[in-house]
Amino acid sequence: MQAKAVTKYVRISPTKVRPVMDLVRGKPVDRALAILRYLPHKAAREIARTIESARANATNNYDMAPDALIVKYIFADEGPAFKRIMPRARGRADRIRKRTTHITVIVDDGEEM
């Protein structure tokens, strides 16, 4: 059985989030959280929050054992970008895109329905 958690509009670029996700994909939830706890990335904190939410969804909504959960799927989709303007020389301006990310985590206990 699977449980899912999504964190939307995280103010980090998806390209910065994906390498951190690769470290925990396929690992048990407890081990994944231990790995993320010691990483010096902002993305690690956001991913850990989403994994904890998925674990809580699994235990409260589906009565799964929290010790048996594995991070089955984890991915980052691109959210909307905030558009900002950076003034440049001679009256010009450049557009800055502050990117956002939607983090999705699906945990599984390995049992079929």
UniProtKB/Swiss-Prot annotation:
The keyword Repeat does not apply. Keywords: Ribonucleoprotein, Ribosomal protein, RNA-binding, rRNA-binding. The keyword RNA-binding applies. PROSITE patterns: RIBOSOMAL_L22. CDD domains: Ribosomal_L22. GO terms for biological process: translation. GO terms for molecular function: rRNA binding; structural constituent of ribosome. This protein binds specifically to 23S rRNA; its binding is stimulated by other ribosomal proteins, e.g. L4, L17, and L20. It is important during the early stages of 50S assembly. It makes multiple contacts with different domains of the 23S rRNA in the assembled 50S subunit and ribosome. NCBIfam families: rplV_bact. This is Large ribosomal subunit protein uL22. It comes from Roseiflexus sp. (strain RS-1).
